[in-house]
Amino acid sequence: MEEPGRPSAAVLIVEDEPLIRMGAVDLIENAGFEVYEAGSADAAIALLELHKEIRLIFTDVDMPGSMDGLKLAHYVRGRWPPVKIIVTSGHVKLTEESLPGGALFLPKPYEPAQITHKVRELLAG
């Protein structure tokens, strides 16, 4: 049962750097969202399969494992089309053409207020 005033959508943070991931999780939780976290694309896919309430993924590009964050974003778009996607990186600048349809790119370092605004905006639309 959802709490009054608490959004019903959950956000999945996918980031291999633990300190950055913890900061992003705190940011999104403080904005009032339920948050799941994964350190790799493989872990993210497992969480998406288990938790149908996940409505947005916020993923870093550079990650170890079978796929990076950009490949994960394309995979999610194909398998779970309604899930909103935000991709971030401090190393590469992605073009709109390289992102899956409807995904946003936010370069690191990002402003906390910018992230919470974009998450709210995407989940409202």
Residue ranges and their predicted role:
Residues P18-Y36:
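Two-component/phosphorelay signaling modules centered on CheY-like receiver
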Residues S40, M67-L72:
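Acidic catalytic/metal-coordinating carboxylates
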Residues L94-G102:
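Short loop/helix-cap segments at secondary-structure boundaries that form the rim of catalytic
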Residues T88-S89:
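Hydrophobic/aromatic residues positioned on beta-strands within the core alpha/beta folds
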Residues M1-L12, P18-L19, V25, A43, ...:
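Non-catalytic signal-transmission and effector/linker regions of two-component phosphorelay proteins
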Residues E37-L56:
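Acidic, metal-coordinating helix/loop segments flanking the phosphotransfer/catalytic sites
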Residues D60-V61:
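Active-site residues of response regulator receiver
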